[in-house]
Amino acid sequence: MHMTTVRLERPEGTPLQTGIAVQIEAASAQDAERLDLQGARTYDVFWIYTLEGVPDVPLRRRDLLVDERENDPETGLPARYRVTGLVETFAGDHQEALCERIIGG
């Protein structure tokens, strides 16, 4: 688990918001199965939680989240995550999104 900030892009390459404070933690194997991510390794699936309420541009399925502080250890580039499940919003308090880490590209 780590805390960082992410940039929200939709569609890929079009930044809509930067500096979204989030917590990123590894998802369980059951979470990956729930999404039916064929071929996804369990360590490529993560839960991302917003830490400072719901962003001005709320997260939604297929959004790309780019880590503004941490690099992907395999590529040396900023870590990138695709929102793959339905995003849950909790009374304007925060959002939770199941994401798959994008390797390379």
Region locations from a protein language model:
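Short, conserved turn/kink motifs that form compact alpha/beta structural patches or helix kinks used as
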Residues: 14-105
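Active-site-proximal polar cores
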Residues: 1-19
